[in-house]
């Protein structure tokens, strides 16, 4: 796009010479000549020429780039129009505070807010130099790092749209995303990753250029190809030179400036999903700015506090949290699953942003440490933890933080007696709870390292994990959302941390529960499909209006596909303080329908089973069968330890347990831990290969992909039910 200004002149010519007259709009050329030697008659010639000066259109983040814009183009207010605008505000408030620490890349990096803003501005201008235009799609296939953040914000600030994915995805998936999104260029993690995908991309979707965030071009094995490849530092250098030129001259006046509109698409994120093919979710700047402005109601982060980041930066949950915390002046350190345990101890973060599986892993690690201690220490620790669990249970009762589906509140006298009873029991348990705090809980908290709160998203926390962390004094705030909702639509507040729930709705966001079959709105306490409406809801699925229409109705309600209910409002009783919180009970698509016609929610059984030390992972199966079954990844180390306690000294020399023995032990554990569930598990399939992101059986947020698991073990499942 370009705007046109006319700077014109009048040129009068007679034979070989002619004066010029400048007139706004065009250039006129006047002249005369002889028509032949036999006549003295002269002809008068007029020629009209148009001289057009082009002004290149520059889409920009007006607040981020305010200092480099011409005075007439600069934004006068401090209102954010786009996500990158947050950096100017943060620099003005927290300029010399440390913003990010990235210790595990080469070179290790630390940036203050001021340095990070300059890094982003250099990258923005460098992208413009290599030809990035507004509204173009740029694929950003990389994992979390400070340079990912710079590239993400740089692409957005040009008015382009970034299409994000991690480097651990398959080549086929990345190629599908690149082609479907109509991306024109590629930003990748490192040379090794590009070498892996280069051949497929060069034949099917050749990008106009490639940028390497880390590493050197000398490591590429694609020499001779026509696609230009730039290093991160080259793009930065291009940007620095262009910005320096602007500062020395009036080159910035050659451009027509246009602000990024809040309703412009900022990013396209392809959902991993536990079922089905990925769809491109279009999130606008306004979607993400709503998250940034309102997450402080749930996470009261303060300047100087430390956050530990280990989730993929390209995931909606991690992105929204990162954007938000950088408006608070916090210090973020990038880590990974490999270094998480050590970094928690070394870094002692105020907050850890993660998913339920990480908290389950921390819980399992603590239980394992306790089990490995001497019998006396083990007995003391487990006893004191049980006392603390009982104490916090009573505390929730008298504070009114217990969930209930009952729509009718209890009578006042019943509530009063209940409150008094909980107070009395808590009073007598308090000294033992304080003893547990001194002897056990402080040591556990010190080993975990989280000093203020753990923030969990991407799924519900298992209740036993939730209760355990509350008992030992670690605040865990669970939130809820989907990629399609930017993602956070509800979260638990520290002052109203209702266990088993995902908290209250975020500001300006509405919830309703509808009947799965009729679509009728259900009253509080009734279970149904969760629907959401408000500013976080996506613009739609890219190039897929039919899929968009299937999930967003004419009134703007988004069908989450999750099952849940809203707690009733009570003025008395155990639930008086938790009215209006959202409780999830699995995915509608996860529901197993037995051949008897009974509907089973597998999540209840799986959460109960995961309390066993012998079970590492589990997927409950049984669609269209007479009874439930399970695919189990056993914890072989724990199984061998348990077996040695049961078998004779002669047999204890056996190094490896048979599959039949492990199956029998797992089945006993399932009967023990799921005895209180509505349904019991029948046949069990033991498999050796864990479900991981790399083998495609888990999503990037570490949720098991049920459809993939069932498909992979289809033949074994058939034999299991014969």
From Swiss-Prot:
An example molecular function term from Gene Ontology annotations: ligase activity
Gene Ontology CC terms, in alphabetical order: chloroplast envelope
CDD domains per UniProt: LC_FACS_like (cd17640)
Main location per the UniProt record: plastid
Keyword RNA-binding belongs to the record: no
Keywords from the named record: Chloroplast, Fatty acid metabolism, Ligase, Lipid metabolism, Plastid, Transit peptide
Transit pept. (range): 1-47
Keyword hit for RNA-binding: no
SUPFAM superfamilies (UniProt xref): Acetyl-CoA synthetase-like
Pfam families reported for this sequence: AMP-binding, AMP-binding_C_3
Biological process terms in GO annotation: fatty acid biosynthetic process
Subcellular location(s) of the protein: Plastid, Chloroplast
InterPro entries: AMP-bd_C_sf, AMP-binding, AMP-binding_CS, AMP-dep_synth/lig_dom, ANL_N_sf, Chloroplast_AMP-bd_Enzymes
E.C. no: 6.2.1.-
Family, similarity comment: Belongs to the ATP-dependent AMP-binding enzyme family.
Function: May be involved in the activation of fatty acids to acyl-carrier-protein.
The protein's name: Probable acyl-activating enzyme 16, chloroplastic
Biological source species: Arabidopsis thaliana
């Amino acid at each position: 796009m370009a705007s046109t200004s006319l700077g014109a002149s009048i040129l009068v010519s007679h034979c070989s010479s002619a004066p010029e007259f400048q007139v706004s709009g065009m250039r006129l050329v006047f002249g005369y000549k002889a028509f032949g030697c036999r006549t003295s008659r002269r002809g008068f010639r007029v020629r009209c020429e148009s001289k057009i000066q082009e002004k290149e259109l520059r889409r920009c983040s007006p607040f981020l780039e305010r200092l480099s814009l011409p005075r007439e183009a600069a934004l006068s207010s401090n209102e954010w129009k786009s996500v990158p605008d947050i950096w100017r505000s943060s620099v003005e408030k927290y300029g010399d505070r440390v913003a990010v620490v990235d210790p595990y890349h080469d070179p290790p990096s630390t940036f203050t807010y001021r340095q990070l803003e300059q890094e982003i501005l250099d990258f923005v201008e460098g992208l413009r130099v290599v030809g990035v235009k507004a509204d173009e799609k740029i694929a950003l296939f990389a994992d979390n790092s400070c340079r990912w953040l710079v590239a993400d914000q740089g692409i957005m600030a040009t008015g382009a749209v970034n299409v994000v994915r991690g480097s651990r995805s398959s080549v086929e998936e990345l190629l599908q995303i690149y082609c479907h999104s109509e991306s024109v260029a590629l930003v990748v993690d490192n040379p090794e990753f590009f070498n892996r995908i280069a051949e497929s991309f060069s034949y099917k979707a050749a990008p106009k250029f490639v940028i390497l965030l880390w590493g050197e071009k000398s490591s590429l094995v694609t020499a001779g190809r026509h696609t230009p490849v730039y290093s991160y530092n080259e793009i930065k250098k291009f940007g620095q030179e262009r910005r320096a030129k602007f500062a020395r001259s009036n080159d910035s006046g050659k451009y027509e400036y246009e602000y990024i509109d809040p309703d412009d698409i900022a990013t396209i994120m392809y959902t991993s999903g536990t079922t089905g093919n990925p769809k491109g979710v279009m999130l606008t700047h306004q979607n993400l700015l709503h998250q940034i402005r309102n997450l402080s109601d749930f996470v009261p982060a303060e300047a100087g506090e430390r956050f530990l980041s280990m989730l993929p930066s390209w995931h909606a949950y991690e992105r929204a949290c990162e954007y938000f915390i950088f408006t608070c002046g916090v210090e973020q350190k990038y880590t990974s699953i490999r270094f998480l345990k050590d970094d928690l101890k070394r870094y002692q973060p105020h907050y850890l942003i993660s998913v339920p599986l990480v908290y389950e892993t921390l819980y399992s690690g603590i239980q394992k440490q306790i089990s490995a201690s001497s019998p006396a220490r083990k007995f003391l620790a487990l006893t004191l933890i049980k006392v603390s669990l009982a104490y916090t249970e009573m505390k929730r009762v008298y504070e009114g933080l217990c969930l209930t589906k009952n729509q009718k509140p209890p009578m006042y006298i019943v509530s009063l007696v209940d409150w008094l009873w909980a107070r009395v029991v808590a009073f007598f348990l308090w000294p033992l709870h304080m003893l547990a705090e001194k002897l056990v809980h402080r040591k556990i908290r010190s080993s975990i390292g989280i000093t203020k709160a753990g923030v969990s998203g991407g799924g519900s926390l298992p209740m036993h994990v939730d209760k355990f962390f509350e008992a030992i004094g670690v605040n865990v705030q669970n939130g809820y959302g989907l990629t399609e909702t930017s993602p956070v639509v509800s979260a638990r507040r520290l002052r109203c941390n209702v266990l088993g729930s995902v908290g209250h709705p975020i500001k300006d966001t509405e919830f309703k529960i509808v009947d799965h079959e009729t679509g009728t709105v259900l009253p509080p306490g009734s279970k149904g499909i969760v629907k959401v409406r408000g500013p976080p809801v996506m613009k739609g699925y890219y190039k897929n209006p039919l899929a968009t229409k299937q999930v967003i109705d004419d009134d703007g309600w988004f069908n989450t596909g999750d099952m849940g209910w809203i707690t009733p409002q009570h003025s008395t009783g155990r639930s008086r303080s938790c009215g209006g919180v959202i409780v999830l009970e699995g995915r509608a698509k996860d529901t197993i329908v037995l051949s008897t016609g009974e509907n089973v929610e597998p999540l209840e059984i799986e959460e109960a089973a995961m309390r066993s030390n012998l079970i590492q992972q589990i997927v409950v199966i049984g669609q269209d069968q007479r009874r439930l079954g399970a695919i189990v990844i056993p914890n072989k180390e724990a199984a061998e330890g348990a077996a040695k306690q049961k078998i004779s000294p002669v047999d204890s020399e056996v190094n490896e347990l048979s599959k039949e023995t492990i199956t029998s032990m797992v089945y006993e554990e399932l009967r023990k831990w799921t005895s209180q569930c509505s349904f019991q598990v029948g046949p069990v399939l033991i498999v050796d290969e864990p479900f991981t992101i790399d083998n495609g059986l888990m999503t990037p947020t570490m949720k098991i992909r049920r459809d993939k698991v069932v498909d992979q073990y289809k033949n074994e499942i058939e034999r299991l039910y014969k």
